[in-house]
Amino acid sequence: MTQAAAPQPWSDRFETALHPAIVVFNASIGFDLALIEYDLTGSQAHAQMLAEQDIISREEGEAIVAGLEQIRSEYRTGQFQPGLDAEDVHFAVERRLTELLGDVGKKLHTARSRNDQVGTDTRLYLRDRVDHIRQQLRDYQRVLLSQAEQHLETLIPGYTHLQRAQPLSLAHHLHAYLEMAERDWERLGDLRKRLNTSPLGAGALAGTTFPIDRQRTAALLGFERIYANSLDAVSDRDSLVEFLAAASLIMVHLSRLAEEVILWASEEFRFVRLSDRCATGSSITPQKKNPDVPELVRGKTGRVFGHLQALLVVLKGLPLAYNKDLQEDKEGLFDAVQTVESCLEAMTILFAEGLSFQPDRLAAAVEADFSNATDVADYLAARGVPFREAYNLVGRVVRTCLEQGKLLKDLSLAEWQALHPQFEADIYTAIAPQQVVAARNSLGGTGFEQVRSALASVRQRLEATC
């Protein structure tokens, strides 16, 4: 559906109006309205600086700041709802300000371009969202930590190649995801430092002839520094790429845990039970309880990956400085932010109240396999048998047990000693699952003391950043 073209601030250069279909095609107001609060804040800082520098009068500056605040109120109450004819959020605000203030409103854009304006708005927006996502990561970590602390001595099979390898403390398994989330939190913190740089005052690309104070607007908006090069200031989208890369890694980590929950909730595993609060039913099979939350997290991950790739492709061939291609940086950014925030919230709820681990089922799984085989080899190696020789011997023992339908614990002491004279009665203690886990007490290992210490460090870290 097309919409009649309205005059734009640049219309006097042209002899005919923009084609109605191109108005729609060109407009970004349908999505960049998400920046309106930041656009208003940035414009208020700009107007204040213009007045302080005597570029406009003090009275004009105060009127503009008040007018922008009125627009903010109108937007929040639904009275101000710009349409596609506004082209973008910046023109929409300027048009409404001019309606309120007349010619005074037209002075707001003095010494400013949409190029430095949109860069400022986007950084203000992303700075807020980064802070929010970092807080969400902390909330998610607290829930995982609570689960881990409850299950320090609960055992779970540890897998490589999705084959049972060695038993683990369930807390150790969850601690791995806590560490992934910590890296995500730190990565966003590093990004925020670079994000906190103001492009405002760079103009279209070359600066301005007016005696502006860029440091002042940066301070008013809470930026720590300004861009040193005006051309770089309006061309740079590094922080958006960095965010999308960091967001992609967050989603990788959430998706891996989601995949495990999906497996654990299956009838074949039954390691967790899903609560009614976080599962759905089937339209045809009444017995089912579907793990929709982790499945959606897993599915939404690809969206964020796609937004990262899309922005990289947009940027790779762009000459400096601004090109209309850069309008394509925002929809993917906004969607990625919303996706990460919703997935973090959903996974936090899932682990807070949406699932319960089944220790008996987990213990039975650990008991009924050969994941203690490495400990038999270690037992012999600790008694002087070369590890590779011990490894090969245990491999033959496992094959024999499989042929006879036995587990290692089912072998008699005589059978053990027939395999190698170094075996003593304490072999049964060495291969008991709790001992297998407890014995791995190397730094960072799954031994209970190591895990207890690791979780204490995590809790200390979280409490320090409440």
UniProtKB/Swiss-Prot annotation:
Its EC number is 4.3.2.1. It is found in: Cytoplasm. One of its GO terms (molecular function) is argininosuccinate lyase activity. Transmembrane segments: none annotated. The keyword Transmembrane does not apply. GO terms for biological process: arginine biosynthetic process via ornithine; L-arginine biosynthetic process. It comes from the Bacteria. Signal peptide: none annotated. Keywords: Amino-acid biosynthesis, Arginine biosynthesis, Cytoplasm, Lyase. InterPro entries: Arg_succ_lyase_C (IPR029419), Argininosuccinate_lyase (IPR009049), Fumarase/histidase_N (IPR024083), Fumarate_lyase_fam (IPR000362), Fumarate_lyase_N (IPR022761), L-Aspartase-like (IPR008948). The keyword Kinase does not apply. It catalyses: 2-(N(omega)-L-arginino)succinate = fumarate + L-arginine. Pathway: Amino-acid biosynthesis; L-arginine biosynthesis; L-arginine from L-ornithine and carbamoyl phosphate: step 3/3. One of its GO terms (cellular component) is cytosol. Belongs to the lyase 1 family. Argininosuccinate lyase subfamily. NCBIfam families: argH (TIGR00838). HAMAP family: Arg_succ_lyase (MF_00006). This is Argininosuccinate lyase.
